[in-house]
Amino acid sequence: MSFEEHLKLFNIFHFKSFDEIENFAYSNWPKPTRDELKFLNQREKADPSSGFIDNLKFYSAVGKSEILQSLILSERYGSYESSSNFVIESLNGFKTILDIGCSIGYLTTYYALKIPESSFIGIDFSFESVKKANNMKKKLNLNNIDFIVRDMNKINYPNKYFDCIVDTQSIYYSKDYLKTFNHLRKILSDNGILITIPGIGEKDLIKQYINQIQNAGFSIINFKFIETINLGEKEYLPTITCSLKKPKEKINIDHVINKLFN
């Protein structure tokens, strides 16, 4: 099954423009409810500066509504495709993998299908999203994956439990990066890696984010930007791979960032 076919199971589609979304909506979606129209008209978004409750309300609303789910997630199709390609290339050899902020499970289930020899745990703080993820797990007959409702700062697994931790634009919404990275460091094995792909497009914010990773005791072993296209617009996603071990060769963070922004 291709990535595009897989995401269609979650009503996530590859649109090239907002006009394509609008035309598809009129032809395929039922009439929105009053609450859905209010949500769409206000164009509410999850925001790193918002509190836990506000972001929970946002993702719960998306998790409850098929229309909102399809619209909001389809807008970022390109990011999901580029991120998944990068993550799958990085997961080879790891047996126990944690996916943080799994939403309705569209990426976690794809990883589990592509790497059946590994076991996956997907966590999200939205009950509605996790419920949908578990339903899709059953539909796909996946036995190497579990979805649970959990805050990323309260993951109650034994120390050094996971070989790999994957984050696709979720830690970015944490109110306290250092607290989150310190917590994740405890549950990552000595030889494991943390892959984080934050939704950050500003030079200084990327540097601040990486500084907090390093302050938590991680070393950066790979850092690069991957190109993606969302609704016809080109973007570059920072991909940061971290380890608890010192790298053989230090990554020049400023050089990588300046190469893109200058």
Question: Language-model features: where?
Answer:
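Conserved SAM-binding loop of SAM-dependent methyltransferases across substrates and taxa
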Residues: I104-P116
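Conserved alpha-helix/loop element of class I SAM-dependent methyltransferases that forms part
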Residues: R76-G93
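Conserved beta-strand signature within the Rossmann-like core of class I S-adenosyl-L-methionine
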Residues: G192-G199
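Conserved SAM/SAH-binding beta-strand->alpha-helix loop
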Residues: S126-E128
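N-terminal auxiliary segments of SAM/dcSAM-dependent transferases
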Residues: M1-F52
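A short glycine-rich, Lys/Arg-flanked "PGG" loop and its adjoining helix->strand segment in the class I
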Residues: L178-D190
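Conserved SAM-binding loop
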Residues: A133-N134
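A short acidic, Gly/Pro-enriched loop at the edge of an enzyme's catalytic core
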Residues: N153-I165
